[in-house]
Every structure is written in structure tokens, then in C-alpha cells.
Amino acid sequence: MASSAVVNAEEFDSAGVKIHYEIKGAGEPVILIHGLYASAKLNWDLPGVTKELAKQYRVIALDNRGHGESGRPAADSEYGEKMAGDIIRLMDHLHLTNARVVGYSLGGMIAMKLVVQHPERVRSVVLGGMGWFRADMPGLHYWEKARDEDNMFVPAACLRAMSKLGVTAAEVKAVRVPVVMIVGDQDPLLQACVAPMHKLRPDWPEHIIKGAGHMDCVFKADFKEQLKAALEERKD
């Protein structure tokens, strides 16, 4: 069994923005992308996800731009698709040809944009608390425009640029990389995003975590078990 000790905790320059990341464990690379208002520590370390996966994988968890210990650019143009670009630049920085990707909530949106734009760099995707995020989702435009002030968790620019992470039905149908979805049965995104995605891609397994909402799903033991199983079953 590989050691789960911290191998590396560093930062690199991603197109002019500092990106903080940590690596734990050894083995096949798995990149963890956290959700909105969170960080790698809050989304993955605190619930024990990193520790569990690091028993078997080389776990690479970054703080998205605008979050955690990473840089916080002020311009809207520095978010959206550039957040997916950070993953590619991180992989290049670490000399990774490809990797498995796990994204939760906003991280799932980034993961989907990544697999649409760079399928050759992604071996498989696990979407947690997220499914089909569209640029034309009802209320999204108002939600973005209503966020005009920065806060301690994330710059307003990140919120205003969220629609740039949307993917179309045609793009979803064209994905040939294996995808698995994991979501809590009390998560409102189950019906808003996950069910529509499953309708588009019934070949993508959907695992429902009982008694879990959006914020606490990653803390559930069943989430971690389903995540490990999803990574294992999607191996070539």
C-alpha cells in the first residue's frame, strides 16, 4: 500500500496566476477539483477523501484560481474556461500525459469543460454533486449579475464568469471518456443537473447517496466508497 504522506505542497504559475496544489500518495494520478467557495483542504482533506484515495493513487488536489491559497485575479476574463486551462497547465507542470479527474460541484463543471476541450488528457471523470451545467440554465444570468461584490471566499468575477463553463447537449453526447456521477438524494442539483445529464447519457452510471445534501455529501462514507469504486471500475 502506498504511503499517504504529503509528497509535495507547492505552487506554480498558470498563465500569470499562482495556483497552489498538494500531492499525496503514489500511483496512478488522480486530480481533485473542489467546489465553489471551498478549497482543496475544505472539499477533500477535511472529509477524508484525500487520505482515502492516497492509499492507492497519486492524489493531486489544487486550489482553483480565486480560492484558497491560489491567486485571485479581478477580471471576469480570468475565470470560466481558464479554470479548466489551469488543470491542463498543472498537468504540464507535473509532466503528466493524462490523469483521472474528480470534480465536485463547480469542480464538476470544470471537469466537464476539461473533457470536452481536452479529451486526450483525461482518462476518466467522476462528477460529484454536478451533472449537466448549461450556459442557459434558468436564473443563471440573474445569479451572475447579482454577484457584484467580492467576498472572503471568492472574487465576484469568478461568479460572473460561471456561464463560460457550460457545455452543450451535443458536446455531452460527443464525450467518449468514461464518466460516473455521484450525488446526494437531498441535493437540489440531482433534479436540476444530474437527472438531465443521465437522460442525455444513460450509459453514464449514476450513484445516489442516501441522506446526503449538496454540502455534506463528501463527508458520507458511502460517497468515498462509491468514489473509489468509480475510479476502479473505470480503469482500462
Please provide the spans of the model-predicted regions.
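Short beta-strand/loop motif that positions the catalytic acidic residue
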Residues: V175, M181-V183
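Catalytic histidine-centered segment of alpha/beta-hydrolase-like enzymes
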Residues: A212-D222
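N-terminal cap/lid segment of alpha/beta-hydrolase-fold proteins
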Residues: A5-K18
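Conserved hydrolase catalytic core segment
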Residues: T97-R134
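Conserved loop-alpha-helix segment in the C-terminal half of the alpha/beta-hydrolase fold
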Residues: K51, D185-K210
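Active-site nucleophile elbow and catalytic-triad environment of alpha/beta-hydrolase enzymes
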Residues: P155-E171, L189
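Active-site loop/oxyanion-hole signature of alpha/beta-hydrolase fold enzymes
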Residues: K51, A61-R100
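Conserved HGGG/HGGXW glycine-rich cap/lid loop of the alpha/beta-hydrolase fold
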Residues: V17-E69
